[in-house]
Design a protein with these regions (language model features):
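Histidine- and acidic-residue-rich, metal-dependent catalytic cores
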Residues: 2-267
Length: 267
């Protein structure tokens, strides 16, 4: 409660709930965004980010998929069950066309009759790189608009425009190479994938993917920092009370939202 009697909510709580909601929308475990956030802060601390940058990284990690509804209709048309598709492909390197194509031919729409499946695959491959760039550009713009309503800092809003980029410049929507991306984005790109592979295959799987994709999707220096103390870093995402860990990990003093800001928050 403020001096004027206006109630205040903690920004970390609101953004944490949004992160959980986007996890559900992507068919991921409900604490994917939280675990990713915890990994981001741990890696960020180890590379020497200050509290201001760590706070921006913290909120960026939780809001990464804030614009996920922007392309829902298009994705449903392309993928059928777009939530299932997002869940089943979360482990793939989207920058490796051969790996992605092999997954589609081996796994996509396997529950459909052969003729239907063939038609669905043909339709899926109309999703050209140009269409993907357009779609992800819309996602980023929606995320940035929503984030501005929450009152997060300009570095978070700016960072949301890069969350689908890659270190090698082969990402989307703009193909910005790693050295020109904010460091908080590069940390998030790595930690988002570390969470998926650690959850699916354990520390060795996370380590293997990090090394294989260094210089491609990931910043090699960040990969080296992770691999130097892999188990200790991954341990922060394995606690029994992840929500409490999330709130305790918020860098700097807790930030609040007053009631009018809360009612403007995306929901």
């Amino acid at each position: 409660m403020t001096a004027s009697g206006t109630r205040r909510a903690r920004l970390a709580e609101v953004v944490g709930v949004i992160g959980r909601a986007t996890d559900v929308g992507l068919g991921l475990p409900i604490e994917h965004a939280i675990r990713t956030c915890l990994l981001c802060v741990e890696v960020g601390r180890r590379i020497g980010l200050d509290d201001a940058d760590l706070a921006d990284l913290y909120y960026l990690a939780l809001l990464r998929m804030l614009g996920c509804t922007a392309g829902s209709a298009q994705y449903a048309d392309l993928f059928g069950d777009e939530v299932r598709f997002a869940r089943d492909t979360a482990h793939l390197d989207y920058g490796d066309g051969q790996v992605f194509g092999a997954w589609v031919m081996g796994h996509f729409a396997q529950d459909q009759p052969p003729a239907t499946r063939e038609a669905m695959i043909d339709h899926l491959f109309t999703y050209t790189p140009e269409r993907r760039r357009e779609s992800l550009s819309g996602h980023c713009e929606v995320a940035q608009l929503f984030a501005a309503q929450l009152g997060v800092g300009p570095a978070v809003i700016d960072g949301l425009g890069y969350v689908f980029e890659r270190y090698d410049g082969m990402g989307a929507p703009s193909g910005v190479p790693g050295p020109r991306q904010p460091v908080i984005v590069r940390v998030l790109t790595l930690c988002n994938e570390l969470e998926v592979h650690h959850r699916l295959g354990g520390p060795l799987a996370a380590d293997t993917v990090a090394r294989e994709r260094a210089g491609g999707a990931f910043d090699p220096e960040l990969v080296a920092a992770f691999c130097a103390d892999r188990d200790a870093i991954l341990a922060v995402a394995d606690g029994p009370a992840l929500w409490d860990d999330l709130l305790a990990t918020e860098p700097g003093p807790p930030r609040g939202l007053n009631e009018p800001e809360l009612f403007r928050a995306p929901g």
